[in-house]
């Protein structure tokens, strides 16, 4: 992957390593896998869900006698379900913390994921945002300091009348953890805004709110054709804060990420 990578197009140093957390808690930790298992269960991160579904379908074609059940509910649920022995594999789109590792899970990296800041294409200053982007300090002010800001102010215009509506994730998830870390070594609980559960609902909220801003995972903002989903725009991050989006900062399609 080139450039940077985080909330938005910011293909910078924030790369979220998605993981399948192999569950091994309790007495099962050192036990050999059952060869006669007929159902394999996975739960967790929305970021990994689309990939896990495809893998499950491919696995079932090779092993038709085995059923693969995949459910999404956020990285926190994936880790908790795995530790509790409720599923065979927990999908976690962040690094597991020490407390989770101490409970006997085995983390297996499977891919890199990215988190992107998004707005509606109906945003009143969408063209200016595309040219100027947003800075980390602006996002910090919105999400951590709860600063009241208009979109016109964001792009340097006076007399703004369109307040920024801030959306964040209400479920424990890797996207929020990654975004918070990028803003300044924060945690998900430090982020403020209107709570929305899951990537699909988050994107839908922004698409239906021209003044909204949020963040979402790579798997949900880009379609199969590599384009940004219809109705949304990725907010590129002005990393060097020079007042414009340089070529290496711009993300307009999946290939840029």
Question: Which residues does each predicted region cover?
Answer:
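Bacterial N-terminal signal peptides that target proteins for export
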Residues: 1-10
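Short, solvent-exposed loop/turn segments at the edges of secondary structure
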Residues: 110-114
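Core hydrophobic alpha-helical transmembrane segments of single-pass membrane proteins
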Residues: 10-17
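C-terminal motif of bacterial Sec signal peptides marking the signal peptidase cleavage site
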Residues: 18-22
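Exported/periplasmic ABC-transporter solute-binding proteins
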Residues: 23-83, 92-101, 106-108, 118-257
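Conserved functional loop/turn residues at catalytic and ligand-binding sites
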Residues: 86
């Amino acid at each position: 992957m080139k450039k940077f990578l985080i909330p938005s197009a910011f293909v910078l140093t924030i790369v979220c390593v998605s993981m399948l957390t192999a569950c091994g808690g309790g007495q099962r930790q050192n036990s050999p896998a059952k060869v006669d298992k007929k159902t394999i269960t996975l739960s967790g991160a929305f970021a990994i869900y689309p990939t896990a579904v495809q893998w499950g379908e491919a696995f079932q074609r090779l092993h038709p006698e085995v059923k693969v059940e995949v459910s999404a509910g956020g990285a926190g649920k994936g880790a908790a379900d795995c530790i509790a022995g409720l599923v065979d594999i927990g999908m976690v789109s962040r690094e597991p913390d020490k407390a989770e590792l101490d409970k006997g899970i085995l983390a297996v990296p499977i891919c890199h994921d990215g988190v992107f800041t998004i707005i509606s294409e109906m945003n009143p200053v969408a063209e200016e945002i595309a040219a100027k982007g947003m800075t980390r300090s602006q996002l910090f002010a919105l999400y951590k300091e709860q600063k009241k800001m208009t979109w016109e102010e964001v792009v340097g215009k006076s007399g703004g009348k369109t307040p920024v509506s801030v959306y964040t994730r209400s479920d424990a998830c890797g996207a929020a953890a990654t975004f918070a870390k990028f803003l300044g070594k924060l945690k998900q609980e430090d982020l403020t805004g209107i709570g929305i559960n899951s990537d699909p609902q988050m994107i839908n909220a922004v698409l239906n709110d021209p003044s909204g801003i949020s963040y979402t995972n790579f798997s949900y903002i880009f379609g199969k054709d590599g384009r940004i989903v219809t109705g949304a725009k990725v907010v590129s991050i002005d990393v060097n804060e020079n007042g414009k989006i340089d070529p290496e900062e711009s993300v307009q399609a999946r290939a840029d990420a």
